[in-house]
A protein has these predicted regions:
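Non-catalytic, C-terminal membrane-associated alpha-helical segments of glycosyltransferases
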Residues: 129, 133, 146-170
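A short, conserved alpha-helix in the catalytic core of glycosyltransferases
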Residues: 64, 69-75, 80-106
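Conserved donor NDP-sugar-binding/catalytic core segment of glycosyltransferases
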Residues: 2-35
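Alpha-helical elements of Rossmann-like donor-binding domains used by nucleotide-donor carbohydrate transfer enzymes
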Residues: 2, 6-9, 89-93, 137-140, ...
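Short, hinge-like loop/turn segments at secondary-structure boundaries
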Residues: 36-42, 118-121
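Short aromatic-enriched loop/helix-cap "lid" or pocket-rim segments at secondary-structure transitions
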Residues: 31-37, 113-116
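A recurrent flexible, glycine/aromatic-enriched loop bordering the glycosyltransferase active site
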Residues: 46-66
Length: 170
């Protein structure tokens, strides 16, 4: 019930000198929501929720706190990204220029119909066309990371291809 209060307290402590603040998103059973884990690098989920704040570079829009001046400076999320990676692109755009943080004491419950990590190999066939946007958006997002981003994309897409071949419909 005090998630917003925790974000406002962090805002005051940081004197507005940050890009965004993010809450810890939990499932109704109290476990972390895998789809809403923040990233400490573009390639690695946040390892710990210890301490008053954890630096992060990407976050979900679930309980994301931004100052209006940040939105005015960086603009809005890319509208065409809607469905997948719009939040990661936007938060990464901001974190390239400003420090950003997860505030572990700020906790929200995010009930989702499907709380698993996105995986084309295990998803239902009626959702497969949506993955076009997932992969397109990832290319835009990770190419901004230079050579390492391209290598990440190649490795991730190769892994997804192997999963589809192993687990996809026969």
């Amino acid at each position: 019930p005090d998630a917003l209060q925790q974000l406002l307290q962090a805002d005051a402590e940081l004197d507005g000198q940050y890009g965004w603040l993010s809450s810890r998103a939990l499932a109704p059973d109290g476990k972390d929501q895998p789809m809403n884990l923040q990233r400490s690098t573009p390639y690695k989920d946040l390892a710990s929720f210890a301490g008053p704040r954890q630096p992060a570079v990407m976050a979900s829009f679930v309980s994301l706190f931004l100052r209006s001046s940040t939105v005015q400076h960086f603009g809005l999320p890319i509208a065409e990204f809607f469905i997948w990676s719009d939040d990661w692109e936007y938060t990464r755009r901001i974190s390239r220029s400003m420090p950003c943080y997860v505030i572990p004491a700020s906790r929200v419950v995010h009930a989702m119909q499907n709380a698993t990590v996105v995986n084309i190999a295990t998803d239902t066939p009626d959702r497969w066309p949506r993955y076009r946007y997932f992969y397109r958006n990832d290319v835009v997002l990770y190419r901004r990371e230079g050579l390492r981003g391209w290598l990440w994309l190649i490795a991730k897409d190769a892994w997804h291809s192997v999963q589809v071949l192993r687990h996809g419909p026969q």
